[in-house]
UniProtKB/Swiss-Prot annotation:
Pfam families: DUF1414. InterPro entries: UPF0352, YejL_sf. It comes from Escherichia coli O139:H28 (strain E24377A / ETEC). The lineage of its organism: Bacteria, Pseudomonadati, Pseudomonadota, Gammaproteobacteria, Enterobacterales. SUPFAM superfamilies: YejL-like. Belongs to the UPF0352 family. This is UPF0352 protein YejL.
Amino acid sequence: MPQISRYSDEQVEQLLAELLNVLEKHKAPTDLSLMVLGNMVTNLINTSIASAQRQAIANSFARALQSSINEDKAH
């Protein structure tokens, strides 16, 4: 069943493009980009989510990330 979001595709795509532009501007390699984005996720969870919900949110995020990974052999 498809997920229904309260955010428009345009909002998501615009924010994604801006974040990618920052990483490209700094010529951040993939490992640094992943470290920074991971730290950002951790910071958001720790500062914006009630402590009782943090583990569940982190688990849900991890599952969503894993399910969105494309397993083709391109790289």
